[in-house]
């Protein structure tokens, strides 16, 4: 039975019923299902879930032990609770008819290209073997990549991929060199990074629509953004050493902007603007040194 639903995640600690499946099917907000509290799903549980995934392919399943995917051929989005849940050499993945999204904590995934003909989204976390990092270049259909606290040494291995989304959490790779090659990138998010000092690669990402830099400790100044004509969202959150936001002046008025950090607040130039609501009231009160053209921006007329 479904024990609880938290946000977009459903947890179950006992056998699933037909009523559970009906509830899950009707809940359009569910995005992830996983066993909880040490419960080991039965074949009957997995067969019920397989019926659900046939109808709701956007829902992800978190595997908790090897062998579970054998009964889930319709599953398209899967992650593992701990390393090893997909069997030796990721062999359990062969049971899936179409693998679209995969979350790995496995340090060695050199076998992944064998199962990745349809893989569009990949999330990696933790330590990676050197050979595993190198095999990323073979995932030619990949569109979205998430690196959370990994040990990837360089972005060179993804330079030829047609990625549209990239998320980097942590300090590795310790240089952004190679990111300038990702010309198809539309969304970039970097968080909790204290190693990158040079963000000039941003000027080459001409198709970028969303830029989010959070807790980037060594970001001191922005590069010119005027060549990024597709930008619609810029967030510079808690970048405490960022001293100036002058490049934001060149952004169009249909671009949502949030920029804050210790030095910006001290200088009275922290900034928040939405095309729908205009400049935030807290900004008008606290950021007395904002450039006049930023402060004067108005919301779009409805």
Per-region residue spans from a language model:
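Concave beta-strand-loop units of leucine-rich repeat
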Residues: 3-25, 29-71, 76-90, 98-111, ...
